[in-house]
Regions:
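Glycan-recognition and catalytic cores of secretory/periplasmic carbohydrate-active enzymes
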Residues: 1-189
Length: 189
């Protein structure tokens, strides 16, 4: 399925806006391009590209994800990448950008991804830490917190932060695969 899908994804959804690589959205019924938005949930894709071996695209898209993060010191739920305006200003403490940072570090050994992860973590703590845990943000521009912390923060976001800074042999990705909830599962051979 991946082999059949990735070429059309790269052909029809990849969008070079300025110097950045982004992936837009399409109507699943017609295939027509619909939006020039990219967001927190899309930030898993650099990691998936890295897992598939396409490190050049993975690096470029991760650079775009990090640019999205740095616009306001934390990523919005959705950004219009053509205008660089926030389309949905919430931040739900999502793991996807950290996940991609981990995979890129794992596959390249490039210290820039640990530095990127350090910035992500420091901003995460600075804007989301509370006396009782971590709080989602209602607005990444104002940094207004909301009384919400989804379970994936502990199950995924912190796990990927840990893995990014742990010894590289903490998980052997030749023997382990992380599922969509970041649970390690033994790979069949």
């Amino acid at each position: 399925m991946w082999e059949a899908s990735i070429a059309p994804i790269n052909k029809y959804l990849a969008d070079n806006a300025g110097t950045q690589l982004w992936y837009g959205h399409a109507d699943m019924q017609t295939g027509s391009r619909t939006l020039t938005t990219y967001g927190a949930l899309d930030a898993f894709f650099p990691g998936l590209l890295a897992l598939s071996g396409d490190l050049e695209r993975a690096r470029r898209l991760q650079s775009s994800s990090f640019k999205m993060w740095n616009l306001h010191g934390i990523e919005p739920e959705t950004l219009d990448y053509h205008t660089l305006r926030v389309a949905n200003s919430a931040y739900h403490l999502r793991p996807e950008i950290v996940e991609s940072t981990y995979y890129l570090y794992h596959f390249t050994g490039d210290q820039r991804y640990r530095r990127m992860g350090e910035k992500l973590f420091n901003d995460f703590v600075r804007y989301c830490r509370t006396d009782a845990g971590y709080a989602a943000l209602a607005d990444v521009v104002t940094k207004q917190q909301r009384d919400e912390m989804e379970s994936f923060v502990l199950a995924e976001t912190f796990k990927y932060f840990y893995l990014l800074f742990a010894s590289p042999n903490t998980l052997d990705l030749e023997k382990i695969v992380l599922n969509t909830e970041a649970h390690p599962l033994m790979r069949e051979r």
